[in-house]
């Protein structure tokens, strides 16, 4: 079902973009805040909280948006925000910009990810729904299995700016694939 349904194949592409953005945040926040900017563990927690706040704001607004439009539009807009946020990260120079960027990535993350349950329910019957949710879980985690090591390896080898570049490319290609697949 998953690979035969265009909107679910599009979701798989969006999963890769979401994984790219979350990999940058989860893997490299400590490096950016403590090693690059010289701030404390507390500042690291605050930066991660900004990502969470962005995600929560988006999740709170999303039900009203979904009453007025299909799942596709906010999911694609959210993924575009992830691409933009990762791309802007290439030019990151200070902590204040980082927390604003993390909030933007949180908004994009939630817009991209939150409607996926509705999409899965709409694409399945009661009998195949558990298998479809299990497939989504496995496939989304396989995206993380690629992007988390990529974020760390590129960052450790060539620096966080290179990690931003690599993950921006992954997210952008994933967005293009989603748009082309999910019409």
Model-inferred region functions:
Residues 35-37, 146-164:
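Transmembrane alpha-helix termini and helix-breaking/packing motifs in multi-pass membrane transporters
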Residues 73-88, 165-169:
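Structural signature of the two symmetry-related core transmembrane helices
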Residues 168-183:
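Multi-pass alpha-helical transporter architecture, strongest
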Residues 1-61, 160-161:
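A single, central transmembrane helix in multi-pass transporters
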Residues 10-11, 18-26, 51, 59, ...:
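Substrate-agnostic recognition of the 12-TM MFS/MFS-like secondary transporter fold
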Residues 90-102:
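Helix-loop junctions at membrane interfaces in 12-TM secondary transporters
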């Amino acid at each position: 079902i998953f690979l035969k349904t265009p909107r679910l194949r599009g979701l798989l592409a969006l999963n890769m973009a979401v994984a790219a953005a979350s990999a940058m945040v989860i893997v490299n926040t400590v490096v950016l805040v403590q090693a690059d900017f010289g701030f404390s563990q507390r500042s690291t927690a605050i930066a991660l909280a900004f990502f969470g706040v962005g995600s929560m704001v988006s999740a709170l607004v999303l039900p009203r948006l979904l009453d007025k439009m299909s799942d596709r539009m906010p999911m694609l807009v959210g993924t575009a925000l992830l691409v933009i946020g990762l791309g802007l990260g290439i030019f990151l120079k200070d902590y204040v910009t980082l927390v604003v960027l993390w909030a933007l990535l949180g908004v994009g993350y939630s817009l991209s990810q939150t409607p996926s349950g509705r999409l899965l329910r709409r694409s399945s019957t009661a009998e195949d729904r558990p298998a479809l949710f299990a497939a989504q879980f496995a496939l989304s985690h396989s995206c993380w299995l690629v992007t988390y090591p990529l974020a760390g390896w590129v960052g450790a080898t060539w620096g966080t700016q290179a990690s931003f570049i690599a993950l921006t490319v992954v997210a952008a290609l994933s967005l293009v694939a989603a748009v082309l697949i999910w019409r």
